[in-house]
Amino acid sequence: MKLHTKSDFTALMHRFLDPLLPLYSEGGARLHLGDTGVTYPGRTIEMEAFSRPLWALAPFWTGGGRADDFLCIYRKGLASGTDPESPEYWGDPNDYDQLFVEMAALACAILETPESVWEPLTDAEKADLAKWLDTINHHDLPGCNWLLFRVLVNLALDSVGMPCDMARAAADMAEVDKWYVADGWYSDGPADIKPQKDYYNPWAIQYYTVLYSVFAAKSDPARAALYRDRATKFGQQFARWFDENGAALPFGRSLTYRIGQSAFYSACIWAGLEPLPLPVMKGIIVRNLNWWLERPIFDRDGVLTIGYGYPQQYMAEQYNAPGSPYWGLKVFLLLALPDDHPFWTAEAAPLPVELTRAGVTGQPSADLLLQRLPDGQLNAYSPANYEKDDHGQFVEKYGKFVYNTRFGFSASRSYVQLEQAAPDSMLAFVIDGWTFVRRHSDRFVLMGDRLLSEWRPFPGIKVTTELVPTKWGHVRNHTVESTIACTAYDCGFAVPKFAAGFAAAANGTGAEAHNDICRCTVQGRGGEGFLVNAYPNTNLYDPNTVIPAVRYDVPVGTSVFTTTVESRHE
């Protein structure tokens, strides 16, 4: 899709939002998009779906856009949703309530365009909305990026002269500042809980602190300057998560937010920051959006689906409701830019040569080792140093040996069968029919050109894995100390098996699967070539895949297994 002018981006916003118009409730405060469940009740699910389009609509209205149909719905919905006497009342929030998450979009809408969403309300409606938002100051929140929702809400309340708690907001920001690591990276929570470093940097912590740097530029100039400096450093690092064709690294949780991957650069442009030249940032955004538009991410009615490269529930979080994917609309903050902003005439530029040159680059502040292959593939080697098993498929999202922008990764159906486990990019141990993989590492060392981790897939088995990048992939050196005789499968990437030109074979000590677009080869020093026919709908990119692997017999005692994994992609 052509994405160059403001009208191009506006048309894309309407492509995402117009299918929702007939689905809003009579009072405008709820939006029913589907019937799958999450950890919060139906009225919260429908409030979430109502709130998230504001991430695009508020900037659109700020930038002079007209969408009177949506404006009418949201003015009505903000009133009925916060009126305790209304049948569409969103409810009184409790501790750790999902409603606090959704308050962020409402707060930003008030901050960005009060003339659209605040000033038209009656005094009674303003009082109801402010009182409902203020509940965030009287409840506990998780110690993660959620604290910044309270900051945004208090900024919004303060901006319209309503009761707020800026002292509470300052305490929240002080807590978040403790999580800062270096190079622009934060951990998503205090260090003692081993929090992850993932997309909750660009589309959450960094995104919100950039917003703060603008909205609080006069009231808190020192912190605003600090946040802008950190965002600049982060923007130079984060660009390495994108490959030249627009794909972003599939890694971590909440990946159903899809187009939100490039939202950080929209925030930078909106805030007047240039961690990279403006044309380069535009190129990242345009290519990433078009990469998504080439995939079946909408249903037949044009509504976004839960999933990644196609509708898929296995990879979903327990908090991914039918309206959740619209969180990615943060990328449309660009629409707040004035019509004469240079962004609208700048040509989308490619990534700088220094970011795409083949080779290995460490990102120690993110606990990753990044590798560019000669054909443009991006590999990210992960130490599996997170332990939040309360998030769905956490092992698959953080524990693979390597994540690749062209092959994606697989989320298991179950571990009762190797095919259902779909353990691509893992060393999978099969014991009594059950599959066991690296859940997290006991210890890891990130070196300049390799990654070492120690892990225990099962009581009585200890594995030390060394990952060494090569020109077209990497070598895995595993030292296995086992008190159990079992079988292990060292697996490569998942290859689409119903694509044109597909073929796969296991010969001797290796295996290969390829089609007209991609190829993955796995070769062991010893062992036996093997093909894993992964369960349908496990891979994030393609619903039907085969995983080439090497099968090793694991005796009692100490064994050393060496496997080379290489990949090609057009």
Regions picked out by a protein language model, each given a short descriptive name:
Residues 85-90, 129, 244-250, 257-387:
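Carbohydrate-active enzyme catalytic cores, enriched for enzymes
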Residues 414-570:
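Extended repeat-based interaction scaffolds and adjacent low-complexity, acidic/S/T/P-biased segments
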